[in-house]
Amino acid sequence: MNASSLPAPTLQHVLDLTVYVAVPIEAGTVVGLNSRGKRRIIPITGGTVTGQVNGKVLPGGADFQIVVSETTADLDARYMIELDNGEHIFVQNRALRRGSVADIAKLVRGEPVAPEAIYFRCVPTFEVSSPALEWLTQSIFVGTGARFPDRVQLSIFRVA
């Protein structure tokens, strides 16, 4: 068997998230420049989760971004989900977001941009304490996202 005959992975939809965000804290006032770009911190104020698990995104998390250029940002969001049954899931979601100079400038100003104009892909990982949720720690997950003025929409898929 050679590598080209291996089966291609498939994607299974797992959940959708709506993550509400506050006004970004820009690098000049908080962290400053680093070797890769400017630091931007976007507080997470809440949200919803639907799909194979259902619940809410708790306030208190944040997206710790590095703005690499006028067109590209590396994202590192960390937040807690509380499920309807009271269980908790900690999420670390690393992502890449890029678009044209004009479209990224609109996002920064809080203006809407068509989701298809922005490349926004993520790789979330999950920490759980419940054996019933352990499946979230035993697969690779990927997702696609869209940034709106007050929120981020994410669809998450298990790589099968």
Residue ranges and their predicted role:
Residues 1-160:
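Beta-strand-enriched cores of mature, soluble protein domains
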